[in-house]
Amino acid sequence: MKFEPELESGKLIKRYKRFLADIKLEDNSERTIHCANTGAMTGCAEPDSTVFFSTSSNLKRKYPNSWELSVTENNHTICVNTLRANQLVVEAIQEQNIKELTEYDELKTEVKYGSENSRIDILLTGKSLPDCYIEVKSVTLLSESGQGFFPDAVTTRGQKHLRELSEMAQLGHKAVLFFAVLHSGIEKVSIAHHIDQQYHSLLIDAIENGVNILCYQAEMSSKEMKIVRKLPFSI
């Protein structure tokens, strides 16, 4: 995924009202940008940190700039735009970069499924293959020693998705929970049972029901983002 034009940078003043952030540019002018991430953003939104933002060509947008990346004091890069995770995984699958999913030849997004009326992030189909339901989750919470965690806050929506994936697996389909690691400092991923114990329990059930876990990391810069490597996962 290439950023065209290349992302611009500034210094974070503050994030507020969940969807907005104020930044200071190199000329000391201030600008309000849109924040697509409604989560806790733990460790991703420290005042005076460097942020990178894109500019929309849609002239009707009230806030044409979108917060894309943050750089931490340890020089780690984090993608804070939650919309990018799905786009990156779709691109990686289409470019045959996810070895576990290369046998499928058709990809759809946002397809209705399940008894709880959800929409699956990605649906893969192929001749003589079970349908493959993929739910994508962005991982940006870093603890000590390169340990990444998901989720960074209690997620009832995520719990629902695990129930839906379990249902698909039990019906004979392939079900995948795909962790897109969008923090350059993360070296391995685990479930944050200390944050959302119910999610942890549901994931154990999901794995027992046949849900597959994939965990891949992206490289990120002001010019592009790309899924590049598989990371270890533990429950």
From Swiss-Prot:
Give the GO molecular function terms.
DNA binding
Q: Which Pfam families match?
A: SfsA, SfsA_N
Task: Tell me which family the UniProt entry assigns to this protein.
Answer: Belongs to the SfsA family.
Matching entries from PANTHER family are given as: SUGAR FERMENTATION STIMULATION PROTEIN A
> What name goes with this protein?
Sugar fermentation stimulation protein homolog
List the source organism.
Aliivibrio fischeri (strain MJ11)
Per the UniProt record, the lineage of the source organism begins with: Bacteria, Pseudomonadati, Pseudomonadota, Gammaproteobacteria, Vibrionales
